[in-house]
Amino acid sequence: MAKKKSDQFEEALKKLQDIVEKLERGDMPLEEAMEAFSEGIRLARVCHGKLEEAERKVRILLKEQEGDWTTSPFEPASGEPPGG
């Protein structure tokens, strides 16, 4: 059975967090650290792609007062700058 996209994101994010923790400890041999770094970059791209996909979906149809449907861009409420 195929995994849900949210499961794929959560799994990739967990693996990425594990890799970051291992790299931050600084006790990996260089070759292993380089492989982990490469895998981390790949996972970061997967997560970024999933987040972009989610953002596109958040550009949901909003019903205006007149009953018309319109799209509205996603505006983060956190006050963080875009990409940050």
UniProtKB/Swiss-Prot annotation:
One Pfam short name: Exonuc_VII_S
Biological processes annotated in GO: DNA catabolic process
Keyword annotations: Cytoplasm, Exonuclease, Hydrolase, Nuclease
Known EC number: 3.1.11.6
Substrates-to-products reaction catalysed: Exonucleolytic cleavage in either 5'- to 3'- or 3'- to 5'-direction to yield nucleoside 5'-phosphates
Principal subcellular localisation of the protein: cytoplasm
Cell compartments where the protein resides: Cytoplasm
Molecular function as annotated in GO: exodeoxyribonuclease VII activity
Location of the region described as Disordered in the Swiss-Prot/TrEMBL record: 65-84
Top-rank EC class of the record's enzyme: hydrolase
SUPFAM superfamilies tied to this protein: XseB-like (SSF116842)
A GO cellular component entry from the record: exodeoxyribonuclease VII complex
Family: Belongs to the XseB family.
Function recorded in the entry: Bidirectionally degrades single-stranded DNA into large acid-insoluble oligonucleotides, which are then degraded further into small acid-soluble oligonucleotides.
Subunit structure: Heterooligomer composed of large and small subunits.
Protein name: Exodeoxyribonuclease 7 small subunit
Source organism per UniProt: Syntrophobacter fumaroxidans (strain DSM 10017 / MPOB)
